[in-house]
Design a protein with these regions (language model features):
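Solvent-exposed, charged helical/coil patches
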Residues: 1-45, 123
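Basic, amphipathic alpha-helical patches used to engage nucleic acids or provide basic targeting signals
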Residues: 51-121
Length: 123
């Protein structure tokens, strides 16, 4: 028997509600990256935006390859947020999900490199 791969991991209706709200409030960098991921534009991979999984909401998620892409603003530079992000990444790794993090600036200024990195993680 094969192990069940996480898709939403029993995310609650509250988490789904937050995810839907976040779709309407994406940052400029998230919108920019989404335009390059949506509709299987990157290597024919299906990405979802603001995807709920367990108690988390992933900026972008490719279930087929178990890859999460997070776009971080400046708030993620604080010690508290770095620790929170590390814990979140650890938990997602326990579920078999690889997490890639980029800054808003990397997405806006180095999109080609960002997309190449995502492709390499999704092999």
């Amino acid at each position: 028997m094969t192990e069940k791969r996480p898709f939403n991991l029993d995310a609650t209706p509250i988490v789904f509600g937050f995810a839907n709200a976040l779709k309407k409030e994406m940052t400029e960098a998230e919108k920019f990256l989404w335009e390059n991921l949506r509709n299987r534009k990157l290597n024919n991979l299906k990405f979802r935006r603001q995807h709920p999984i367990g108690k988390f909401i992933l900026d972008f998620y490719c279930h087929e390859k178990m890859v999460a892409v997070e776009v971080d603003g400046r708030i993620h530079n604080t010690e508290e947020m770095r620790e929170r992000d590390e814990g979140r990444t650890y938990m997602l790794a326990e579920w078999g999900i690889k997490v890639i993090r980029f800054t808003n600036e990397e997405v806006i200024n180095e999109l080609h490199a960002v997309l190449e990195t995502i492709k390499s993680f999704a092999r």
